[in-house]
Amino acid sequence: MPVDRDIVLEKVRSHLAEELGVDAGGITDDTHFRDDLEADSLDLYELVMELEDTYGVKMSEQEAEQIVTVGQAVDFVAPRAEVSA
């Protein structure tokens, strides 16, 4: 069962704010991981691992490389997410 998109967005924003030391309120769908947040490949790998662990989503390396904005990450995860009771 898909997870509400807003829930995934909040998780991504929270993770990025904590890991990168940025204001979560400034993170939008259009926020670019590298250009706007200056995230490096390790930061992005950690985000992918967090999303996989939290939502049971598997993302290939090729899929991860295609995701460059917060909105793209959320749109990938939300419909594929597994909800645990």
Question: Language-model segments: which ranges?
Answer:
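Thiotemplate assembly-line natural product biosynthesis machinery
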Residues: 1-24, 79-85
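Phosphopantetheinylated carrier protein domains
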Residues: 44-67
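C-terminal structural segments of small proteins and small subunits
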Residues: 65-84
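Helix N-cap/coil-helix junction residues
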Residues: 21-22, 39, 57
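Glycine-rich loop motifs involved in handling phospho/adenylate chemistry
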Residues: 28-40, 60-71
